[in-house]
Design a protein with these regions (language model features):
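N-terminal compositionally biased or targeting/leader segments
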Residues: 8-10, 16, 29, 88, ...
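Extracellular, repeat-based ectodomains that mediate carbohydrate processing or recognition
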Residues: 45-343
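N-terminal secretory signal peptides that target proteins for export/translocation
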Residues: 1-24
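Bacterial N-terminal signal peptides
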Residues: 28-41
Length: 343
C-alpha cells in the first residue's frame, strides 16, 4: 500500500485490527465511501492530500506489535497495543504517549501490572481534561477477565490493574470502551452464562478516579444463543449507544446486528432494535456524525459465493430510528472485505 494511502487513513482515524493487506484496502474503500455519504453536499469534489510523511511512531521495538488502538484529545493522546515483549509471560499491553500533532512523547510504557497469562485486545479513551482509560482482556485461556487502568493528566497511573467486575467472575472477553462527555467511561464486554443462556453483553460505568460508578448491567434483552462483540459510542446529551451481534433473533439461521440506547448512568432508554437486514452479519462498529449514528458491519453475500464478505452500513437517529436503508459500502466485491473501523 502506498504511503499516501496510509496517511489518508491516519487522518481519518481509521484503525485496523487485522494486518492483512486486503483489510487495509477494504477499510480505505469503506472510509472514503462512508465519508462521502455524510458530507452535506453529496456532489462535492472531496480530495485527500497527505500532510506529511509516514514515520515510525514507536521506533524499532522487539517482537510483534498487534491490535493497535488510538485515541486523541485536545492535549494529545495514546496509542496502545499488545506485544510479546512487554512482559515476560506471553502478550502484554504497551502504550505510547502522543502530542497534539501526532509526535511520540518519550518511550513506550507497559500498561498492565498483572502479568499472568496473555493481555490482549486493548482499547484506550482520552479524558477531556487530560488522562486516559485503558481496557483489555487478560488472564489464562478460559479464565479471561476484563481489566482496566486509569492514567492521570500527568501520565501517572493512579492504581494497579482493576477488574471490570471481580477476579472470580466468569469468562469475560471482547472489551470495548468509550469516554462520555462528563469524563466517565463505559466499559462493555462479552460474558459467558451470565444472562441465563450462552454469551451475553454487559457494561459498567467507571469514574475518572478509577472507581466504579455503577454495578455491571446487562446490555441485551434477547438472551437466546449468543450476544457478543459489543461496541459503544458516546452521545451528545451524555448517554451512549451500544451495538452488538445477536444470534438467531430474526430466524434460526441469522446472525443479527442489534443496538440499544442508554443514559450516562447505564439505564436503558430504548428497547433492543435490530439494525441490519436478515442474514449473516458480524463485527459491528458505530460512530457519531453530527446528530446521527452510523453503524457498519460485515455482511456475508449468500447469493454470490465468490464475493463472500462485504461491508454494509446504515444511518440512524439518536433513538435508533433508521434514516436510510442498509447499503454496501465497498466498491470491490470479489473476496473478503472485513475489519472495518470508523471514528
Amino acid at each position: 500500500m502506498m504511503n499516501s494511502d496510509k496517511i489518508v487513513m491516519r487522518n481519518l482515524m481509521v484503525k485496523i485490527e487485522k494486518i492483512h493487506q486486503i483489510s487495509h484496502r477494504a477499510v480505505r474503500v469503506f472510509t472514503l465511501v462512508a465519508f462521502s455519504l455524510v458530507v452535506s453536499d453529496l456532489n462535492a469534489d472531496v480530495r485527500f492530500k497527505p500532510k506529511g510523511h509516514e514515520f515510525e511512531l514507536t521506533g524499532k521495538l522487539v517482537g510483534d506489535q498487534l491490535g493497535t488502538s488510538l485515541s486523541l484529545g485536545p492535549k494529545g493522546g495514546f496509542a496502545v497495543w499488545q506485544d510479546n515483549s512487554t512482559d515476560p509471560f506471553g502478550y502484554g499491553i504497551a502504550a505510547q504517549r502522543i502530542d497534539t500533532v501526532g509526535n511520540p512523547v518519550g518511550s513506550p510504557i507497559r500498561v498492565n501490572s498483572l502479568l499472568e497469562g496473555d493481555q490482549e485486545k486493548p482499547s484506550v479513551g482520552m479524558i477531556p481534561e487530560g488522562g486516559a482509560y485503558f481496557v483489555w482482556q487478560g488472564g489464562a485461556s478460559g479464565f479471561h477477565r476484563v481489566h482496566y487502568r486509569v492514567v492521570n493528566s500527568l501520565g501517572v497511573f493512579i492504581s494497579e490493574d482493576n477488574f471490570a467486575t471481580t477476579p472470580d467472575s466468569g469468562e469475560q472477553t471482547e472489551p470495548s470502551l468509550v469516554v462520555l462527555n462528563n469524563g466517565s467511561a463505559i466499559l462493555s464486554w462479552t460474558d459467558y452464562l451470565a444472562d441465563g443462556s450462552h454469551k451475553g453483553v454487559s457494561a459498567r460505568v467507571i469514574g475518572k478516579d478509577g472507581q466504579p460508578l455503577t454495578e455491571s448491567f446487562r446490555l441485551n434483552q434477547f438472551n437466546d444463543g449468543n450476544q457478543h462483540k459489543s461496541k459503544v459510542v458516546a452521545l451528545p446529551e451524555g448517554g451512549f449507544a451500544a451495538v452488538w451481534v445477536s444470534d438467531q433473533q430474526l430466524n434460526q439461521k441469522s446472525l443479527d446486528i442489534v443496538g440499544r440506547i442508554f443514559s450516562a448512568d447505564g439505564k436503558p432508554l430504548t428497547d433492543e432494535v435490530v439494525l441490519a437486514p436478515e442474514g449473516i452479519n458480524a463485527n459491528p462498529v458505530v460512530s457519531l456524525t453530527g446528530n446521527n449514528l452510523v453503524v457498519a458491519w460485515e455482511q456475508l453475500n449468500l447469493n454470490q459465493q465468490q464475493n463472500r464478505w462485504d461491508i454494509a452500513m446504515r444511518s440512524f437517529d439518536l433513538n435508533l430510528k433508521p434514516l436510510s436503508d442498509a447499503s454496501i459500502a465497498n466498491i470491490k466485491l470479489k473476496g473478503d472485505q472485513f475489519a472495518t473501523q470508523l471514528e
